[in-house]
From Swiss-Prot:
CDD domains, per database record: WD40
Protein name: Platelet-activating factor acetylhydrolase IB subunit alpha
Region of interest: Interaction with DCX: 367-409
Coiled coil (UniProt feature): 56-82
Subunit-level organization: Can self-associate. Component of the cytosolic PAF-AH (I) heterotetrameric enzyme, which is composed of PAFAH1B1 (beta), PAFAH1B2 (alpha2) and PAFAH1B3 (alpha1) subunits. The catalytic activity of the enzyme resides in the alpha1 (PAFAH1B3) and alpha2 (PAFAH1B2) subunits, whereas the beta subunit (PAFAH1B1) has regulatory activity. Trimer formation is not essential for the catalytic activity.
Similarity-based family: Belongs to the WD repeat LIS1/nudF family.
Modification type Phosphoserine: residues: 109
Residue ranges, annotated region (Interaction with NDE1): 1-66
Chief location category: cytoplasm
Listed GO biological process terms: brain morphogenesis; cell division; establishment of mitotic spindle orientation; germ cell development; lipid catabolic process; microtubule organizing center organization; microtubule sliding; nuclear migration
Name of the gene encoding the protein in the UniProt record: PAFAH1B1
Length: 410
């Protein structure tokens, strides 16, 4: 690229200013002589710091160009594969698209968890305002509020039929609700601190919970009795989730580990440690994703001939990790969020991962290529939770901005 005489003169003066102001006196005097510069104070002021300014603005522009290029590639991909003009996408590849279909407000404090009902077109949100709210995600209508907890509701879980809802709270209790009559039918006491997570086991007759008292407990639905306590985490247990058949449970903690427990014996089958900060969330891979995962990670099929099980974890270290539970190996780390990762799960088609974080975004990852393929600026504040409907094309998110948003996938 050829510079004009004026540009060359400006560049020379800026270089001379840089050499002089950074103490390269000898180089400055040689350069000044060779470039035939007559420096004077008036001119000097004009060129003070000019080289640094140009340099930083070039870097800034480069970054912007790269961002725009990646957005352009994303748009091209959409155009060829999923836009109204291209081929219709297979529902297995539908992903959430902005803008949101509904932004639902009603909670008076941050939303802590959002989940879909397994049968009806409703979803449920829990909040630090001590309430649970029920919404119709197809119409955006608010349906009702469940009241009973006296402090922040931290987590909620349906049984497979959707007739029972379990909730847990910073008030140290777990409540079981009849979701047909919307009545609280049982309250379970036993944890000594904030109960941060709850899940109804796949068979529907037990509930697992995790708390800041460092324990995981298992409760009988019928009686409300605590029948097992799993100990091993050294700090606050953030989340607990059973696998599909209920033989294993996974938990994650402030101690920066993910643990997998055998339900029958209470033994810790695996302790997964590679995160460098609190692990906020975990999610089991559905069997529909096993072949994609094996292909993406080259994890060889074991002697039993069955791959997996696989687990996802999201952490305050801003990363998402995928684990092979049988070997305890971390298969991949997804980097892209700019803040704590608060929710992570597999797309029901098995090819993608969805996550949400305190960087206010909802992201879709193509894990085969270890890249973030879509970023949605989802909320005005931290995104605390997300859920993906098993059969309908919807994603729901909850946030510290007190809203719940419904996103349509296509």
């Amino acid at each position: 690229m050829v510079l004009s005489q004026r540009q060359r003169d400006e560049l020379n003066r800026a270089i001379a200013d840089y050499l002089r102001s950074n103490g390269y006196e000898e180089a400055y005097s040689v350069f000044k002589k060779e470039a035939e510069l007559d420096m004077n104070e008036e001119l000097d002021k004009k060129y003070a710091g000019l080289l640094e300014k140009k340099w930083t603005s070039v870097i800034r522009l480069q970054k912007k160009v790269m961002e725009l290029e990646s957005k352009l590639n994303e748009a091209k991909e959409e155009f060829t594969s999923g836009g109204p003009l291209g081929q219709k996408r297979d529902p297995k590849e539908w992903i959430p698209r902005p803008p949101e279909k509904y932004a639902l407000s009603g909670h008076r404090s941050p939303v802590t968890r959002v989940i879909f009902h397994p049968v009806f077109s409703v979803m449920v949100s829990a909040s630090e305002d001590a309430t649970i709210k029920v919404w119709d995600y197809e119409t955006g209508d608010f349906e009702r509020t469940l009241k009973g907890h006296t402090d922040s509701v931290q987590d909620i879980s349906f049984d497979h039929s959707g007739k029972l809802l379990a909730s847990c709270s910073a008030d140290m209790t777990i409540k079981l609700w009849d979701f047909q009559g919307f009545e609280c039918i049982r309250t379970m006491h036993g944890h000594d601190h904030n109960v941060s997570s709850v899940a109804i086991m796949p068979n529907g007759d037990h509930i697992v919970s995790a708390a800041r008292d460092k324990t995981i407990k298992m409760w009988e639905v019928q009686t409300g009795y605590c029948v097992k306590t799993f100990t091993g985490h050294r700090e606050w247990v953030r989340m607990v989730r059973p696998n599909q058949d209920g033989t294993l449970i996974a938990s994650c903690s402030n101690d920066q580990t993910v643990r997998v427990w055998v339900v029958a014996t209470k033994e810790c089958k695996a302790e997964l440690r590679e995160h460098e900060h609190v692990v906020e969330c975990i999610s089991w891979a559905p069997e529909s994703s096993y072949s994609s995962i094996s292909e993406a990670t080259g994890s060889e099929t074991k002697k039993s001939g069955k791959p997996g099980p696989f687990l996802l974890s999201g952490s305050r270290d801003k990363t998402i990790k995928m684990w092979d539970v049988s070997t305890g190996m971390c298969l991949m780390t997804l980097v892209g969020h700019d803040n704590w990762v608060r929710g992570v799960l597999f797309h029901s088609g098995g090819k993608f991962i969805l996550s949400c974080a305190d960087d206010k975004t909802l992201r879709v990852w193509d894990y085969k290529n270890k890249r973030c393929m879509k970023t949605l600026n989802a909320h005005e504040h931290f995104v605390t939770s997300l859920d993906f409907h098993k059969t309908a094309p919807y994603v729901v998110t909850g946030s510290v901005d007190q809203t719940v948003k419904v996103w349509e996938c296509r």
